[in-house]
Design a protein with these regions (language model features):
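Hydrophobic alpha-helical transmembrane segments of multi-pass integral membrane proteins
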Residues: 1-349
Length: 349
């Protein structure tokens, strides 16, 4: 799942940024991955069976592996020789703290429902989903883009990017906290979104400057651009609509309405972009083989990105007939599936 992918992602980039092996190395990372999967399964089992004690144990396992990751990155950071990008690793530690917080809030949703406190459950649901989306996923992705974006474009990073990104981190956390608390007072969602997007601009403005120097023409960079656009747009809509909601239940429906664009437009697309970029790196084989793999992964890049996003927009348009929306969604999935075909073709080269 996305949690396991981000766990691997954050560990890899923390190693890269800090130039020091993580505490516990690969063994601790493997243990954390197993614990995350086990904890998630136990939580779902507990909720399905209506056993709150089982769900709490599962949430505790997820929280424990997240805190273990925080400790590993913190020790790794303290042992680093203060390289220029070391402070960016703090994004991963903060994101893991937010993951642990989100896991606890997720359990509290189940606990509230079990005790007939539906209004309280709605409030915890808002806090859980926004903490996981904006905090855990958003903070990790934005922190990583600072380093990965210029690398994907094969150009130097903007000199101000590390400093701006580090200064933007408190705004990401503060904005997430405000949006998470909107179950108490809906307008907090609008205020929190503004604060959060302000923190995101600390990453996106240097990224935009980099893109002006070297336009994103490969599939990976164009897909990443579209993914970030979906994320920013969804966060803006989320904040605006939740701030106008009558109560927590209405705000919950706002989140439900944005699940597909966030999952397909943001999460899936950023994953596809990362895999498209990393496949030539992982396969290796020398410069000639890497160029050949890049050529395969970038075939019809402009068409694939444009078609996938246009079809997704049409699939989400409520005014279109359902038959059109289904066909558009299927076409978007079909175009996106070229990634798998590209990987197979690359292996045969």
């Amino acid at each position: 799942g996305i949690g396991s992918a981000i766990t691997i992602w954050s560990a890899h980039f923390a190693d890269t940024l800090l130039h020091r092996p993580a505490l516990g190395g690969a063994a601790l990372l493997d243990a954390r991955l197993y614990a995350h999967s086990l904890g998630t399964a136990v939580v779902l089992t507990g909720i399905t069976m209506g056993q709150q004690a089982v769900a709490l144990i599962g949430a505790g396992i997820v929280m424990a592996q997240a805190i273990a990751g925080v400790v590993a990155i913190t020790v790794q950071y303290r042992r680093a020789i203060a390289p220029r990008l070391a402070s960016l690793a703090l994004h991963y530690a903060v994101a893991l703290v937010l993951l642990a917080t989100g896991a606890l809030l997720g359990f509290l949703i189940s606990w509230s429902n079990a005790h007939g406190r539906s209004a309280l459950a709605d409030g915890f649901y808002l806090a859980h989903t926004t903490t996981m989306l904006l905090g855990f996923v958003g903070t990790t992705v934005l922190g990583t883009l600072t380093v990965l974006w210029p690398t994907m474009l094969r150009t130097p990073m903007e000199p101000v990017a590390p400093r701006w990104t580090t200064r933007g981190l408190p705004y990401l956390v503060g904005g997430t906290a405000l949006v998470a608390a909107c179950g108490l007072w809906p307008p907090l969602a609008g205020l929190g979104t503004l604060v959060y997007l302000g923190g995101a601009c600390a990453v996106l403005v240097p990224a935009y400057r980099t893109a002006r120097r070297v336009p994103p023409t490969s599939f990976a960079t164009a897909s990443a651009t579209a993914s970030v656009a979906w994320f920013v747009g969804c966060v803006a809509v989320l904040g605006a609509r939740m701030s106008l909601a009558d109560d927590a239940a209405a705000a919950r429906e706002v989140i439900h309405s944005l699940r597909l664009p966030l999952a397909a437009g943001f999460a899936l697309q950023i994953l596809v972009a990362a895999l498209s970029y990393l496949t030539p790196v992982m396969l290796g084989g020398g410069p000639a083989a890497t160029r050949a793999t890049n050529a395969i992964m970038d075939r019809f890049a402009a068409y694939r990105v444009t078609a996938a996003n246009a079809c997704l927009l049409l699939a989400l348009y409520p005014g279109a007939p359902w038959q059109v929306r289904v066909v558009a969604g299927a076409l978007a999935a079909l175009v996106t599936s070229y990634l798998l075909a590209g990987m197979i073709l690359s292996l045969r080269e």
